[in-house]
Design a protein with these regions (language model features):
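Ala/Thr-enriched low-complexity intrinsically disordered regions
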Residues: 3-6, 19
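Feature captures the catalytic cores and cofactor-binding loops of soluble hydro-lyases/lyases
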Residues: 21-202, 216-261
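Channel- or pocket-lining gating/hinge segments that regulate access to a cavity or pore
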Residues: 211-214
């Protein structure tokens, strides 16, 4: 199920007597991320930087090379936390339309509680002024962490940067920060969303660091870490060669020819 791009009819009326919600397990049926990794496998992925993971995924040829990752607009707020790995809990939200009443937030918390752990909350802004939107601050981040989330990914604004940094272990990925929360409303929960070119569905495995965020296809998730090690080994050979004194283009070509055959 994809997000409609707007709130449901009752949401538009400001009533919020109905918020689209699908049982988490039912949403995952048929999705690639139904098979979950072990804690050890997740820890192994967390020790690897996201660009290396991206390079490893390319080796499996399971998607196009310009698919599966977010653009530069979604920035890592706390690079000192290292790599964030978790399963997506998705929703749409609007904080810039006046006079709305929110009855969807508890639905989100219920979805986070039921989701595979660690979880990453993914919030798609569908309001009328995304540059002034705000979808999470200290209270929501603290609640999310208590329920097993390790971060929030949003194409809208977030806030309370210092307080959320002080939580430790909770990452923000967003375009920027906003001082006021406006009129925050959760519209739909457990829907497929697209943020800055990255399409995310409920249960998708996310991997992100200071370089950005991507989705690891479940069909290869248990093999990506091992492939990433091979990528690192190959890159180490290239780096060792080009760091030698007196490098020439001719020598580089000869090396590359031998390296690729």
């Amino acid at each position: 199920m994809k997000a409609s791009g707007t709130c449901s009819e009752s949401c538009l009326d400001g009533l919020f007597y109905y918020t689209r919600f699908v049982d988490y397990n039912a949403t995952l049926i048929g999705r690639s991320s139904l098979s979950l990794l072990t804690a050890a496998q997740l820890a192994e992925l967390q020790r690897i930087d996201s660009p290396t993971i991206a390079n490893a995924i390319e080796q499996f040829d399971v998607r196009g090379r310009v698919e599966g990752f977010a653009g530069w607009e979604l920035r890592c707020a706390f690079p000192e936390l290292g790599t964030t790995v978790g399963y997506a809990v998705t929703c749409t939200a609007d904080s810039t339309t006046p006079a709305r009443r929110d009855r969807g937030l508890m639905r989100l918390w219920e979805a986070v509680e039921r989701a595979p752990k660690p979880a990453v909350i993914v919030i798609k802004d569908i309001g009328q002024d995304r540059s002034r939107s705000c979808h999470m601050g200290e209270v929501m981040a603290t609640t999310a962490k208590a329920l097993g989330a390790v971060g929030c990914l949003s194409d809208g604004g977030l806030r309370d940067v210092n307080e959320v940094r002080a939580l430790g272990g909770f990452q923000y990925f967003c375009p920027g920060f906003v001082v006021s929360h406006g009129n925050p409303v959760i519209c739909e929960v457990d829907v497929e969303v697209t943020l800055n070119g990255l399409t995310v569905g409920p249960g998708d495995l996310l991997h992100g660091d200071v370089n950005g965020v991507l989705v690891i296809p479940s069909s290869i998730a248990d093999r990506v870490a091992a492939q990433a090690m091979k990528v690192r080994e190959a890159e180490a050979k290239v780096l060792a060669f080009v760091r030698q004194p007196g490098l020439t283009a001719a020598a580089l070509k000869e090396f590359q020819d031998s390296f690729t055959h």
